[in-house]
Amino acid sequence: MGKFVIKTQKDGQFYFNLVAGNGQTILKSEAYTTKPAALNGINSVKANAEDDGRYDRKESSNGKPYFNLKAGNGQVIGTSELYESEAGRENGISSVKSNAPGAETEDTTV
């Protein structure tokens, strides 16, 4: 089972990672100014993770596939790592779909 891990950046802003059961980070959030905003972002990932239409499949400037998960309002709520192949990207999306909805939250900022 996956988990969300809330962390702080050096500038004091909050972000979260969705970590799969094997310890691999499969989604990273944008930065948030407050912890409640980051928690709201986690709830948004949980709510949108199972909807394939919320995944924006992209390619980086160096040709590596990745994806963004978007909320209903179109805002990016999480970004994947860069993958070596489109199949790898699809596996990453499947992992978010299966891990996010029931994931616990671990707060490392306390």
Roles of regions detected by a PLM:
Residues 94-95, 101-104, 108:
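Mixed-charge, glycine-accented linear interaction segment located at domain edges/termini
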Residues 1, 107-110:
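Intrinsic disorder/low-complexity detector
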Residues 3-9, 13-21, 26-32, 41-45, ...:
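A structural feature that tracks compact, well-ordered secondary-structure segments
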